[in-house]
């Protein structure tokens, strides 16, 4: 008798879940197919859109983060600055100068030499170099951040990642000169 009651209870719960999922799934599909889904850059974001995406992105990157294969040196910062100036500065700015060309993107590219957030973190200097390396290597879907795995060598991607990890520190005059060597778009 006890088994049949608990079995009936689970059956009702299962049927209730199925009955609930059908209209939710249908509603979600109808909203995506016929509704005003924010797909234009100027549209307001869905509630919690940034938070949901950030959770998924961070989870993936944290599972695949690699360790820095070499120690930091001035030569690496200089070569990282050269690569950054040619490949990254048009979206992410240089020390003291925000990039304006791609500001209308959604999400807007973070300015990697500028303090942000409640803690005043400079760019992504609070991220491990391996985290930034993953982003530089793979890009972020639907954000405008391209993958540089076919454009930059493995070493070059690490050099840029190490440079932006240290964006909150004093850079040598040579690194600053390289970063400021060309006009931003």
Model-predicted regions and their roles:
Residues 67-69, 82, 93-100:
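Short acidic/polar micro-motifs centered on Gly/Asp/Asn
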Residues 173-185:
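Extracytoplasmic/periplasmic copper-protein system
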Residues 104-165:
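Extracytoplasmic electron-transfer domains, predominantly the class I c-type cytochrome c fold
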Residues 2-78, 123-129, 148-163, 182-185:
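Periplasmic c-type cytochrome electron-transfer domains
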Residues 100-106, 175:
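Short cysteine/histidine-rich zinc-coordinating motifs and their immediately flanking basic loops
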Residues 167-171:
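Helix-loop element at the rim of GNAT/NAT acetyltransferase active sites that forms part
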Residues 74-94, 132, 185:
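Sequence/structural segment immediately N-terminal to covalent heme-attachment motifs in c-type
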